[in-house]
Amino acid sequence: MLQKPLIFVDIETTGSTIGRSRIIEIAIIRIENNSIVEEFQSLVDPETSVDSFITGLTGITNRDLKDAEIFPLVYKKCAHLFEGAIFVAHNASFDYNFIKSELTQIGYNFSIPRLCTVRLSRKLYPQYKSHSLEQIIERHGIQVNARHRAMDDIKATWDWWQIAHKEHDHSTIFSHIQSQLKKQTSLTQIESSQISKLPKTPGVYIFYNQDHVPLYVGKSINIQ
């Protein structure tokens, strides 16, 4: 079993472009000893307007955000939840890199272990083609009040996590989790000056060992 606490995180944004789009909502649940110990949810002032598509998707309007605080102030209220934890999200690179981008703009280096439940679902349920949150909710009969709202989405992800642990041997799940976390260790060996030279665009990345043998091939909406 994992020894570290888990934080399930979900954000809603003004768009999908990291560095240009902004966060409009964040929700977090912290898990310790397989139980929720704390929850956090807040709207966020994106310092820009929300278009009709995003409002239609999330139900969040510009009026809703009028009195919201900007992300650095919101983060101060929930930063303690990240301490010593593993960041868990559905399509984790999206949520993680958005938060990292927001904090980088104020000079804060955000870096914690992360775990993607999309990748974990692919490993545990290879018989299925789609592993979107929508499909997972439908497949497992998970009850959700409001899709595309941050707290409802992470509660759905947490429900799936518990279902997966009932349907699979814990050692199998732990092995897949460890594999994900292990692949991230190579990133810590890359100097920040090298990372800053990478493009902030979608693409494919490959990690090689010292003999130039490919170790891992991945893709991201933001290579940096």
Language model features with spans:
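Conserved non-catalytic scaffold segment of RNase H-like nuclease domains
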Residues: M1-I112, P126-H148
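Short hydrophobic beta-strand that contains or immediately precedes a catalytic carboxylate
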Residues: F8-V9, L115, L215-V217
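Acidic active-site catalytic centers that drive phospho-/nucleotidyl reactions
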Residues: D10-E12, D95, C116, D153, ...
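Short, glycine/acidic-enriched loop or turn micro-motifs at the edges of active sites
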Residues: T13-G15, R119, A156, N222
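A short, structured active-site edge motif that brings together acidic residues
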Residues: I112-S121
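GIY-YIG nuclease catalytic motif and its immediate N-terminal context
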Residues: D152-I223
